[in-house]
């Protein structure tokens, strides 16, 4: 069974040597995608025997993941793991994450930072952001996950062949899960521990969080338009009709129109109608696209 570990990296010359040296124990091949680094990440990786994919410029985390997926497919990997280069993931957890794939229990195994309550404490702002994003993601998949944004994952050969990531940003984590769920691939989580010693993140937390949330909403709304737009549309339509009926009742009794009540009613009806139309149109488009795949 061929196990491949893919590592997206951006200016990680301080960490990459130690990670590659220790990952070799668990992998038949290691792929490093250098996403436009201006340090020695590529050179160090090549010297240590890793297969290096080098982007000419920084394209984003999703672009790096996509390049790693393509190379792992080319290598005909039986198990493909993604592992961050920032030093947060523990290399000794690789067998834990890959085990469900090796034993053919699931197609996508996610290393969750929230299943092990004894794991080191995550910064509160990250914990809140990840939980919000995970709740949004769970609207579009069958499984109820605790950590949809973990970059420590393992994929079966089937998942590797059938999933093609397209998002070039941090939204790729959500995109992969939604595509896996739509393809009826089995997804499960396993507990991992994470190191939060020092500031290992290379992203501004506000812009990073906003980008991920917007990407998550985008993929959720596209893949489940009836749920995402249809349910709010029905709610607004019902509220609007109640207020319109109330306006009519008041007018019948007093011959007066209460402006605030009528505006709320009309506005809610219009908004509800727009959301329902959007849901139907998007659902039709998605259905046609899926039927042609």
Residue positions per predicted region:
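Short, well-formed alpha-helical segments that are part of the catalytic scaffolds
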Residues: 6-25
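Acceptor/aglycone-binding surface of glycosyltransferases and processive sugar-polymer synthases
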Residues: 53, 57-74, 79, 91-170, ...
């Amino acid at each position: 069974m061929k196990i491949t570990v893919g590592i997206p990296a951006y200016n990680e010359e301080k960490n990459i040597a130690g990670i590659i040296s220790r990952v070799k124990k668990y992998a038949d091949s290691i792929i490093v995608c250098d996403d436009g680094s201006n340090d020695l990440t590529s050179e160090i990786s090549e010297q240590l025997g890793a297969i290096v994919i080098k982007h000419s410029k920084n394209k984003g985390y999703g672009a790096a993941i996509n390049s790693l997926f393509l190379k792992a497919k080319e290598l005909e990997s039986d198990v493909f793991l993604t592992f961050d280069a920032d030093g947060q993931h523990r290399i000794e957890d690789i067998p834990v994450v890959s085990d469900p794939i090796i034993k053919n229990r699931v197609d996508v195994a996610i290393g969750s930072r929230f299943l092990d309550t004894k794991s080191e404490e995550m910064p509160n702002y990250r914990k809140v952001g990840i939980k919000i994003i995970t709740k949004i993601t769970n609207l579009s998949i069958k499984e109820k996950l605790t950590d949809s944004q973990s970059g420590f994952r393992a994929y079966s050969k089937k998942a590797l062949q059938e999933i093609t990531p397209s998002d070039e940003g941090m939204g790729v984590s959500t995109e992969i899960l939604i595509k896996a769920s739509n393809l009826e691939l089995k997804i499960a989580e396993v507990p991992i521990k994470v190191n939060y010693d020092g500031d290992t993140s290379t992203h501004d937390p506000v812009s990073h969080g906003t980008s991920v949330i917007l990407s998550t909403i985008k993929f959720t709304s596209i893949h489940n338009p009836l749920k995402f737009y249809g349910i709010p549309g029905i709610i607004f339509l019902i509220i609007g009709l109640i207020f319109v009926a109330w306006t009519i009742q008041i007018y019948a009794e007093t011959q007066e129109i209460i402006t605030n009540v009528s505006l709320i009613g009309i506005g809610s009806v219009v908004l509800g109608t727009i959301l329902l139309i959007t849901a139907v149109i998007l659902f039709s488009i998605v259905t046609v696209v899926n039927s042609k795949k």
